[in-house]
């Protein structure tokens, strides 16, 4: 069964630039695991493992929500979730995502699918296993275009164990 989440994808050039910027922080914390550019995204809601049929139903139900997605958003603040040891890029105005997040969550619930009930925090995960107590860091601010929500599946390579995300169509 696929393990899925609803997300907003970023343009490839933005992902490449963010990954490059994040790698510059490797000298601060060489043990951190940095997110590959192809895996950068903005999670709107985590669903978990569902059937392939339900994944297709949810993917189709997300398509009409494009109209609720802001045209663009600014990436540029660095933050950490210390408990989870996550380094992230913050977004502003984060509240502009509330309508699409609320509707995505409502759609998931209406379809009778599981939904992670953690509160939404607008961020893009740049690294995991990030240590504590590092000096403040900055990213160049970028205003990036957004498209509508899509359903993504987590795929683990059986040979390498590496995770990648692919869109459920």
Can you say where each PLM-predicted feature lies in the sequence?
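Histidine-dependent nucleotide/RNA phosphoesterase domain, centered on the 2H-phosphoesterase fold
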Residues: 1-169
């Amino acid at each position: 069964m696929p393990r899925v989440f609803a997300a907003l994808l970023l343009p490839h050039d933005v992902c490449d630039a963010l990954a490059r910027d994040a790698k510059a922080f490797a000298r601060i914390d060489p043990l951190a695991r940095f997110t590959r550019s192809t895996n950068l995204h903005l999670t709107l809601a985590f669903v978990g493992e569902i059937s392939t049929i339900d994944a297709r139903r949810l993917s189709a139900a997300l398509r009409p929500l494009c109209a609720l997605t802001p045209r663009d958003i600014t990436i540029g603040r660095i933050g950490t979730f210390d408990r989870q040891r996550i380094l992230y890029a913050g977004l502003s105005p984060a509240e502009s995502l509330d309508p699409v997040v609320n509707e995505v969550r409502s759609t998931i619930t209406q379809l009778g699918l599981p939904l992670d009930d953690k509160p939404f925090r607008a961020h893009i995960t740049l690294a995991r296993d990030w240590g504590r107590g590092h000096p403040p860091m900055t990213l160049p601010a970028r205003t990036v275009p957004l498209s509508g929500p899509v359903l993504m599946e987590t795929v683990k390579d059986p040979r390498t164990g590496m995770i990648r995300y692919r869109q459920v169509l």
